[in-house]
């Protein structure tokens, strides 16, 4: 069992993009930015407990940080992890939370 404190640290934010919106409509998949050290099992448990939905599968990937320049100085943005969470049939997560 994963502690409640860890569950709250696993999911950082929803990742909203054109691709994630199309995925949500077609495949019932939600995209989250997650902690870089989070496992698929932790992501599945966190989504299931925090949003009270049933999760079918989790796919993860690590986006490598880009090298950026500011004048003569070069730096590197941090790596970050993204999780594609496929929800069970009929399950839904509403991030906007509008009136019903």
Swiss-Prot record:
Record-level GO cellular component terms: ribonucleoprotein complex; ribosome
Keyword Disulfide bond belongs to the record: no
InterPro entries, alphabetized: Nucleotide-bd_a/b_plait_sf, Ribosomal_uL23-like, Ribosomal_uL23/eL15/eS24_sf, Ribosomal_uL23_CS
Pfam families, per the entry: Ribosomal_L23 (PF00276)
Its biological purpose: One of the early assembly proteins it binds 23S rRNA. One of the proteins that surrounds the polypeptide exit tunnel on the outside of the ribosome. Forms the main docking site for trigger factor binding to the ribosome.
Subunit structure, as described in the record: Part of the 50S ribosomal subunit. Contacts protein L29, and trigger factor when it is bound to the ribosome.
Protein name (Swiss-Prot/TrEMBL): Large ribosomal subunit protein uL23
Organism: Shewanella piezotolerans (strain WP3 / JCM 13877)
Chain's gene name: rplW
């Amino acid at each position: 069992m994963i502690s409640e404190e860890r569950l709250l640290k696993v999911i950082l934010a929803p990742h909203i993009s054109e691709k994630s919106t199309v995925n949500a409509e077609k495949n019932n998949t939600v995209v989250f930015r997650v902690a870089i050290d989070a496992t698929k099992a932790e992501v599945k448990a966190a989504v299931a407990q925090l949003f009270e939905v049933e999760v079918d599968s989790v796919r993860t990937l690590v986006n490598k940080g880009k090298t950026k320049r500011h004048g003569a100085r070069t730096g590197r943005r941090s790596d970050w992890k993204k999780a594609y969470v496929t929800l069970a049939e009929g399950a839904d997560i509403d991030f906007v939370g509008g009136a019903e």
